[in-house]
């Protein structure tokens, strides 16, 4: 794989996909990436995460979905520890419990209104151009890596019925959850600056306020 990448001969493969029912009756497209594709995708995510750990975790008091583990900042030096047990994200169950606790605490404070929303078909609707632009402008990802990821995302897009070039990232991978958080990072900054109680678990968002007007703003 490393030889293919260095010679720029690596080509992503079209992955198998299937639908998983959601509680609301809709369907989620699950993508099973081939091993080499998954390794490349995760390696890119690892590099971005370790190089930008501080900026990516500054909002962790408000963000609870797919939160980076502290070991991420050590980057490839983790490979020097043969006994290390490393996970890219903190465990989701404890994070979701913390998210729920924060929501309940805001309710107990007596805040009268809550805006509760999520982004329909979030992973399937992420524009590749937007993601690649953020990776380039804010995280200084090199052009050859952007080209590689762009090619991969196009091949991985859509459903078994066909591609959706330029739109959608594959669900069921940690790298995609990481990229999804990157897309929402600027939204986090905007809402946190408004100083309203704001909490997010991936694309599941809660904003609390004393009036409907301040939430509409």
Where are these regions (language model features)?
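Active-site-proximal segment of RNA-dependent polymerases
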Residues: 49-114
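Catalytic micro-motifs at enzyme active sites that drive phosphoryl/nucleotidyl and oxygen chemistry
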Residues: 6, 15-19, 27-33, 97-107, ...
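Short, conserved acidic/polar surface loops in the N-terminal third of protein domains
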Residues: 31-32, 43, 53-58, 125-128
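Short, conserved non-catalytic motifs in the polymerase core
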Residues: 13-43, 60-86, 159-181
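Short, hydrophobic/amphipathic alpha-helical patches that form generic packing surfaces
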Residues: 38-50, 151
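Reverse-transcriptase-like RNA-dependent polymerase core
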Residues: 4-23, 147-157
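Conserved polymerase palm-domain catalytic core
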Residues: 85-202, 206-216
